[in-house]
Structures are given as structure tokens and as C-alpha cells.
UniProtKB/Swiss-Prot annotation:
Signal peptide: none annotated. It catalyses: (S)-dihydroorotate + a quinone = orotate + a quinol. This is Dihydroorotate dehydrogenase (quinone). GO terms for biological process: 'de novo' pyrimidine nucleobase biosynthetic process; 'de novo' UMP biosynthetic process. It comes from the Bacteria.
Length: 336
């Protein structure tokens, strides 16, 4: 009831202003006793995945708390894990505004944010102050000005810095909003990226005497043949997990709706079919050897169960939280 009233107010604002307003106030209470105002009691439903123990299988997807400003207060909502970022080596403003749009009729969002963030060092300072007891994933990417051919260097810089603080590291090579980034999912660029990331992971494991799993986040807009090649590459390089999926450039399911012509990645309910199919095909190829984190359009208990049936071991929310509120977290965890 409270969130329904709050949503009516927030949805009167521009989506990005609404996000900034919400996070400005959440930041004030994160890590303070006032967190009880939005904290929720959820049952423990432990899941072992990627060598980690998760209190429950539901997490927050990357993109909502890019800079780690509100880790503790978001954790108090009941998430078993939180993924912050996408973060880049240097701060950057992202793409020109407006760049975030609500497709309210479809409970969907379109964004072309472009990895706007305050940089990896700012994120780490926030993580150091956090007392979140769940698993913390850190999603990393490249700066806009870094040429694609040397983009792996940005990922390696971020890995170096976040490794001591991460439960797992998510390598984002699938955002549609950084020019040519998705090319990193193919051919020699993919091979070079995976080789470099695994080599760096081995070095950091030895340096810190602690193994931090690496997951790769992929697009829902891949053909079956492309997915098979990706799966083969992940198996070859012994990647620890796959996050499926990022947002889609296919807007066909929202034709005729408000903002449907806006460019950018579509998330929310219309993403469910392609995300589920990607997970199903990927699961078939990986044969249980690499776990899948399912994300894309989870807005109900049924949608969560469909992701698990398709082959996901863990789940993540983003748009569903915006449209349904924290009650969705509690409902899914209680009944999953």
C-alpha cells in the first residue's frame, strides 16, 4: 500500500529525476537505524552457486545502484545478493539526457544511459563502509573513450581494484548503450577478453589467497548459433557464471505504446520471452557445468519460476522492483 502511494508521486517525475530523488533519500538512511522503515523479514533459502553461499536465490541486478550508494538499505529489503555497477575505471557522465523512459502500459523501461558512474574508486569507498551481509557482485565495463581494441585494459583495471571487495565480478560485454561494446561477444575480441580476464583472475587469486568467481553478462539478441559459440568459449575458459540477460534492442513487443520509438535497451515484462529462451538454449549447451543467473522481466512469482524452469540457478530483479515495489522481493523469496 505504501509503495503504491509513493509510486504515484514518483511516476509524476521524469524517470531519471525520480531515480535520483529516491536514491538521494535512500542514501541518507543506508547503514542507519532508519533502515527498519523499509526492511523486510524473509526466510533463508540457501543456494550454493559459483562456489559461494547465497542466503536466498534472489538478487538485485546491476544498473540500479551503479555507485554502491545504497547497498545496505537495498540489502535490508531481503535480497540474497546485490550487484552494483556497471562501474568503469574513470568517472563518466554517460549519454545525453533524456535517456531513461517508462513504458508504463507494459511495465517496461527503455534506457540509453551509457555507463554513467562516478568511477571505480568512488564505488570502492562506498563498499568499504557497507555492512551488507549477503553476496556483493561488482559489474565492470569500459569507459566510452577507450577504443574497443584495447577495451580489455579497462576491465583488467577494474578487476585489480574491486577484487578484494567482490563476492563475484560481472564482466559486462552486452550493454547496447556503449558504442560497439556488444562486439566483445564475438570472435577474436571475445577470445582475447576471456583469456585476459581468466589470466588476471588467476594472478589475483594468488595475490589475495582468495578466489573470486567471474561471470559474464550476455545479450538476449543473440542467435542460437551465436549462443552456442559463446557457450563453447565460456566452457573452454572455465568462466564461473553467465548472467542472462541484458536489455534488448528488439522493441517489437511494445509497438504502438508510449516511447516505443526511443532508442536504447528495453527491460521489464516484454523482455521475458527472449530472456527465457536465451537461458533455455544456454542451459542446454552448458549442461550444468556453468551456472546461469537469470534476469529479464521478472515481475511476479510465476515469472521467477519460469526462469528457474528454463535453467537459472539464481535470479535478479530491476524493472520489476520499480513497478511492483519491495513486496515483490518478499513474495518471490517466500514462495520460490
Amino acid at each position: 500500500m505504501f509503495y503504491s502511494c509513493l509510486k504515484k508521486i514518483l511516476f509524476q517525475l521524469d524517470p531519471e529525476h525520480s531515480h535520483e530523488f529516491t536514491f538521494r533519500h535512500l542514501k541518507r538512511i543506508t547503514g542507519t537505524p532508519l533502515q527498519f522503515l523499509i526492511s523486510q523479514s524473509v526466510p533463508t533459502k540457501s543456494v550454493d552457486c559459483m562456489g559461494l553461499s547465497f542466503k536466498n536465490p534472489l538478487g538485485l541486478a546491476a544498473g540500479l545502484d551503479k555507485n554502491g550508494d545504497c547497498i545496505d538499505v537495498l540489502g535490508a529489503m531481503g535480497f540474497g545478493f546485490i550487484e552494483v555497477g556497471t562501474v568503469t575505471p574513470l568517472p563518466q557522465q554517460g549519454n545525453q539526457k533524456p535517456r531513461l523512459f517508462r513504458v508504463t502500459e507494459a511495465e517496461a523501461l527503455i534506457n540509453r544511459m551509457g555507463f554513467n558512474n562516478l568511477g571505480v574508486d568512488y564505488l570502492i569507498n562506498n563498499i568499504k563502509r557497507s555492512r551488507f551481509g549477503g553476496v556483493l557482485g561488482i559489474n565492470i565495463g569500459k569507459n566510452k573513450e577507450t577504443p574497443l581494441e584495447v577495451s580489455k585494459e579497462d576491465y583488467l583495471i577494474c578487476m585489480d581494484k574491486v577484487y578484494p571487495y567482490a563476492g563475484y565480478i560481472a564482466v559486462n560485454i552486452s550493454s547496447p548503450n556503449t558504442e560497439k561494446l556488444r562486439q566483445l561477444q564475438y570472435g577474436d575480441l571475445l577470445e582475447d577478453m576471456l583469456t585476459s580476464v581468466k589470466k588476471k583472475q588467476t594472478q589475483l587469486h594468488e595475490q589475495h589467497d582468495r578466489y573470486v568467481p567471474v561471470a559474464v553478462k550476455i545479450s538476449p539478441d543473440l542467435s542460437e548459433e551465436e549462443l552456442i559459440k559463446l557457450a563453447d568459449a565460456f566452457l573452454k575458459h572455465e568462466i564461473d557464471g553467465v548472467i542472462a540477460t541484458n536489455t534488448t534492442l528488439d522493441h517489437s513487443l511494445i509497438q504502438g505504446l508510449n516511447h516505443c520509438q526511443q532508442s536504447g535497451g528495453l527491460s521489464g515484462r516484454p523482455l521475458q520471452p527472449s530472456s527465457n529462451e536465451t537461458i533455455r538454449l544456454l542451459s542446454k549447451e552448458l549442461k550444468g557445468r556453468i551456472p546461469i543467473i537469470g534476469v529479464g522481466g521478472i515481475d511476479s512469482l510465476m515469472a521467477a519460476r519460469e526462469k528457474i524452469a528454463a535453467g537459472a540457478s539464481l535470479l535478479q530483479l530491476y524493472s520489476g522492483l520499480i513497478f511492483q515495489g519491495p513486496a515483490l522481493i518478499k513474495k518471490i523469496i517466500h514462495h520460490i
